[in-house]
Amino acid sequence: KALVLGSGGASATVCAVLNELRARSVTVISRSGEDNYGNLDRHADAEIIVNTTPVGMYPNCGVSPVDLRQFPRLAGVLDIVYNPARTALVMQAETLGIPYMSGLYMLVAQAKRTAEVFEGHAILGSETERIWKKLGREMQNIVLIGMPGSGKSTVAARLAEALDRVALDSDAEIEERNGASCASLIERNGEAAFRALESEVIADLGRRSGMVIATGGGCVTREENYASLHQNGVIFWLRRDLDKLPREGRPLSAGDLAAMYDKRRACYERFADHSINNNGTVEETLRQIMAALPEEE
């Protein structure tokens, strides 16, 4: 049983394909039709959900058309939105362990078929896969997390230079927007107020694509920041021995660093896709990160 969210042109195409694939039933969910978002309970046995609405699309990231927990038999989710790479719907599927797919592959396949029609010749099917992977690499953000002073800003700048990307720094952005240093903002307003500012900035930076993003050491203490960074990014945890972390100009590092690390360690582990040893040279760190990134074909 398949549910198709939305009743526009893309919905008609998806319904045609599902029927061609002999889905047992295909139901269109719209805002005002007989089957709508107010009576989704009647479709709790849905096994496939396809979102054809723009809900969750850039720049309005972070919202989802439905709560997947309403569908205990769900076996697959497709969201035709391709920006961000992982919509809120897709990320919930990921969290629940439900197989999912975003809309980028569909976009590339559609472009391939369009090119064939206009150019009058066939294009190898393998080109769809190649271009899909290439676009995925180019659009993906590379995000750096880690303790204060672990080298995130330095590594981000060098990595961006090596990959011909733009480096963004959440702390620098906070300071530019507020006309004050992060240290003074924390001392003046307290850590909780600073974290709220930080989450706003991270939400903005995370919506962008193809960037290298250095984050503040404490951003992992707010779970909402994970979705902002994960939606378009691969996240690297830069690890550096505590005795090598600088403290000057960092009010939150002035106390017990070991206690801070113990408190945050599980958060770093939760956020990170990869863990990188940053006790050596910047070049060694760059090599580790580059080795973890998908290779070009």
Describe each region flagged by the PLM:
Residues 35-100, 219-225:
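Rossmann-like adenosine-cofactor binding region
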Residues 80-140:
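Adenosine-phosphate binding glycine-rich loop
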Residues 231-267, 274:
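A glycine- and Lys/Arg-enriched "phosphate-lid" helix/loop adjacent to the NTP-binding pocket
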Residues 1-19, 146-148:
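Glycine-rich adenosine-cofactor-binding loop
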